[in-house]
């Protein structure tokens, strides 16, 4: 019992340390590698503009989190991607971070609305809406992703696609958008890995052999399962460890919150 409690305390502490380092590092425009949760390792570069829902969140021209366009004026991301007192820039139609390719649409976020129940210790309710100052121009490179049904449940071993510009290994950030296929895991398997710290608003996905995962800089980005935005990249222990799945915000639990928030902030 003491060993299990110590493991759980260590995991919670690691998440707290990560979130603090995330806020400090990105307030200074820095990137940190090898920490918990900022959660692509072992993936592949996608065909240019083949994931038209993908958003890049940037500060001072530096990518730091992902997001997903869910309609022409709103992007969904993780609550821990909020940076206070700093303008968040959203870039849609992005592929190469280092090159202007003519498809990009850039916005200074008009309003960031973090879920009121977000807990930085447990990382519960890790979800945030970003309102754009004008509607995005929808075209082949920029399209919203549909949301799942409220309360929808994914079967174990459902194949999903995570994407982003996060670390590919040894702290190296890629220039081009990458993606990785992962399978959802049973709740019991994931809860055992994280000593019972999962809440009902979280689910997990993993590549069983290890070596593939979302990682530093992918946070807030999409996990697409069954053609819908079922998950938001949230946290995990390291990146691509065989016995530690990535943890994702369960979007189907927030459909009413998303709809009401948008309706109340037109």
Predicted features and spans:
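Extracellular/periplasmic catalytic domains that process cell-envelope and extracellular macromolecules
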Residues: 46-50, 69, 82-84, 120-123, ...
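N-terminal signal peptide
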Residues: 17-36, 266
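Active-site substrate-binding loop(s) of clan PA
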Residues: 101, 116-119, 135-174
């Amino acid at each position: 019992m003491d060993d299990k409690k110590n493991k759980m305390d260590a995991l919670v502490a690691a998440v707290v340390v990560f979130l603090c380092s995330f806020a400090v590092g990105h307030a200074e425009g820095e990137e940190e590698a090898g920490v918990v949760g900022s959660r692509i390792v072992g993936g592949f570069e996608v065909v240019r503009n083949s994931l038209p829902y993908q958003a890049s969140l940037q500060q001072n021209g530096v990518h730091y989190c992902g997001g997903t366009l869910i309609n022409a004026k709103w992007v969904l991301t993780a609550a821990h991607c909020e940076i206070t007192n700093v303008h968040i820039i959203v870039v849609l139609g992005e592929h190469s971070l280092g090159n202007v390719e003519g498809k990009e649409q850039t916005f200074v976020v008009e309003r960031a609305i973090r879920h009121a129940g977000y807990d930085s210790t447990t990382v519960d309710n890790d979800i945030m809406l970003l309102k754009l100052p004008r509607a995005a121009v929808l075209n082949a490179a920029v399209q919203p992703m549909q949301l799942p049904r409220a309360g929808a449940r994914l079967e174990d071993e459902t194949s999903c696609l995570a994407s982003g510009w996060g670390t590919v290994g040894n702290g190296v950030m890629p220039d081009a958008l990458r993606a990785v296929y992962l399978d959802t895991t049973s709740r019991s398997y994931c809860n055992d890995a994280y000593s019972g710290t999962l809440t009902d608003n979280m689910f997990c996905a993993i590549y069983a052999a290890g070596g593939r995962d979302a990682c530093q800089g992918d946070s807030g980005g999409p996990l697409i399962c069954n053609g819908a935005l079922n998950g938001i990249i949230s946290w995990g222990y390291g990146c691509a460890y065989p016995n530690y799945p990535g943890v994702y915000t369960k979007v189907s639990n927030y459909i009413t919150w998303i709809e009401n928030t948008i309706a109340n902030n037109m």
